[in-house]
Amino acid sequence: MLLLCYVKTVRPRKDVLEASMHIPDGYLSPSTCAALYAGSTPFWYVSLQKMKRRLNTQAVPLLSVFAAFSFVIMMFNLPLPGGTTGHAVGVGIATIVLGPWASILAISVALVIQAIFFGDGGITAIGANCFNMAIVGSLVAYAVYRMIAGRAAIESPRRVVAAAIAGYCAINASAFLAAIEFGIQPIWFHDASGTPLYAPYPLHIAVPAMMIGHLTIAGLAEMIVSGGVVAYLQRAEPALLKTTAPGASIGRDSLGWTSLRPLWTALAVLLICTPLGILAAGAAWGEWVPEDFATPQARQHIAAASGNQAPPTQAPAGLQKLASVWTAPMPRYAPPILKSAQLGYILSAMVGTGLIVLAFLGGAWMFGRGKT
């Protein structure tokens, strides 16, 4: 299971319940966002072309459960050394079970729903977030898994090792891309005085800030989870591991809703446990809101997570302009109708899961209708 963990800076603000490494609006220039949308589009197109023939088959339950798993697992924040936290993405296990193209589609759907309905990741940065996590994550996980697993039997321990290493490589590839995207902003996009317009920290700060946690604790956590889930599936449902065998693909022989009941049950348990993710909640590195740049305590946390280099005295102009470009209906997984953060978190997980299922059912209906 590739679980991509992303670093967060912890601060004592209980209202901030965001998943990390989802680049918000205002941190990337419009031209950077446009380039990453353009770079993601061919992969989305190929993914849809490969999957549209199967969306009216039993592939839909598999796509739904692994996209929903990705959504829910990203709500679990884990503490890391140095006052940061990380969380998983689930793109590795999606790749191993679904194959890379179906994984790209599944994880992209989860990320789009997070951005639109929960404000987790910017609308302008959907292309960037999908490119980093869904596209590169899936392709790296697939390449590493296939290279190491080879033609080993489904029940072989070699596949457990392959999954663990695939997760470690994919998490770091995705984190490194995000670090580069953050780090080039002050180099390429600044005003006449040299003041950054978007993400304020250059490469020599952004890369270590993003990578140290991924190369150590988060990467090791991904190895354990990835290998553990594959080991479980080898015993409980080995058929789910056949998609990434040579020549295999997700198709009409995929398991249906009833056959996937154990996975949905496990997902329900995770959903109920999501409030545990609040315990380590905080603002991710590179996800500070404009007000943080003027708040002494927040500025201290930003500097501590950024090589002890103080942030600008005020939020970059581009960030101030774009940060409020979109207001999500359930921002930060905190529905306005609920005062309880715990219940709000659970409700958000339920709503997100439901929206993912509806998205795939709607896609199946649309593509099926086009064939009649």
Each model region followed by its residue ranges:
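Short helix-perturbing small/polar motifs within transmembrane alpha-helices
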Residues: 133-178
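Alpha-helical membrane segments and adjacent membrane-interface helices in multi-pass membrane proteins
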Residues: 74-141
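Membrane-interface capping segments at transmembrane-helix boundaries
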Residues: 48-52, 235-240, 362-372
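Aromatic-rich transmembrane-lumenal/periplasmic boundary elements in polytopic membrane proteins
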Residues: 269-325
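Hydrophobic transmembrane alpha-helices
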Residues: 19-35, 39-94
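Hydrophobic core segments of alpha-helical transmembrane domains in multi-pass membrane transport
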Residues: 36-49, 69-74, 142, 167-182, ...
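Individual transmembrane alpha-helix segments
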Residues: 212, 315-363
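Membrane-water interface at loop-to-transmembrane-helix junctions
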Residues: 161, 165, 209-213, 247-268
